[in-house]
Every structure is written in C-alpha cells, then in structure tokens.
Amino acid sequence: MKLVEKVTEMGLQIEMICPDHGIIWRKDPSKIINAYVEWSKQVPKRKAIVIYDTMWRSTETMAKAIADTLALEGVDAKPMHLRRCHKSDIITEVLDTAAVIIGSPTLNNHIFPSIGSFLTYMEGLKPAKKIAAAFGSYGWSGEAVKTINSHFETMGFDIIDPGLRVKYVPDKTGIEACQEFAKKIAHAIPA
C-alpha cells in the first residue's frame, strides 16, 4: 500500500507492470493496481473457502457437506480440492474470504502432505482478518485437526471451533455433525 501511495503522489504514468515473478501487464495496468490495493486491504466478504484433500473420499464427503450447508446458510462457499486446484487459485480465493476451513485425513499421525505444504505456503503470505476451522477423517488417531489448528494459531486466525473429526467414513451422524459444524461457522461470519 505504501508503495502504491508513493507512486500515486509522484504522479507517474504507469504504462506497464513488470514483476520479478508473474505475468507482465501491458494493457490497463490500473486494473491490476486497483486489484492489489483491494487485496492488500484484506477486507473479508461473507464468503468461506473449504480447502481439503482426501485419501478415500471421507474428508471430501465432509467438505461437500460443510460447503453445501454454508451455502444454505447464505454464505458464498467454495470447496477446493488441493490436488485438483492450483494453490495460487486457492490463495486468490483466501484473499477476500472471511472463513478459511481446512480438512485433512490423518496419515501416519500427521496431516496429509498436500495440506502441510499448502499451510506452509499460506503462512508465508500472511493472510489476515480470518476466522478458521479444521475438520478431518481418521482411522485410529486423528491428529490432523490439531495440527491444522496449530497452523491457524501461527497465522493469527480466530479459531471458531476446536475442530470436527469423523472416524472412518461419515455416516448419517457424521454428515449431521458436518452440517452443525458449518452452521456454527456461518453464524460466526459477519453479515
């Protein structure tokens, strides 16, 4: 923001944006400058992103139940599978979202590797003003939720629920737990 303000004060006519990394903007650079100004403000919308990965589709079933319930509660909810969506696309969604909800199966007493990698990536970008919640499926130990919450704490997110864990495949009771979890998140998102 400070650099944008400084350039604006100088009255420079910007014709092109050439970053160290990324695409070169030759047309309408003011469009991207305005987008960066909005992104840097990190003003959250009534929106939730449900980021997840899954081994045997149990965590995916949870993610879909959570996203569907959020939508029914009037929240713009977007489920994003980490191995099907590029991390840059996911981070772009994180920029203006109010709630970051991450789901992971427990694998060898840890989070799924793709989730760990993404959390490290997100921590480096320092998103702010987020509420957060973790969920996941497990077979015998279930540490993934606790590990995700630890990352949320590091990022300064407001954890609104200790997390939802479902053993094995979500049955009717598990789906209902996902729905209640989502309703709690929806009520925590400012209107």
Task: Label the predicted regions.
Residues 52-56, 171:
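Short acidic-aromatic active-site loops that bind/stabilize oxyanions
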Residues 34-40, 179:
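Membrane-embedded alpha-helical bundles that constitute the cytochrome b-like, heme-associated redox core
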Residues 1-24, 65-82, 90-191:
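FMN-binding flavodoxin-like domain, especially the glycine-rich phosphate-binding loop
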Residues 14, 42, 52-53:
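C-terminal accessory/connector segments of nucleic-acid motor ATPases
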Residues 59:
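Glycine-rich phosphate/diphosphate-binding loop of Rossmann-like nucleotide-binding domains
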Residues 29-33:
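Interdomain/boundary linker segments immediately adjacent to catalytic/signaling cores
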Residues 1, 40-43:
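Active-site-proximal loop/helix segment associated with metal-binding centers of metalloenzymes
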Residues 47-51, 133:
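Conserved beta-strand elements of the Class I
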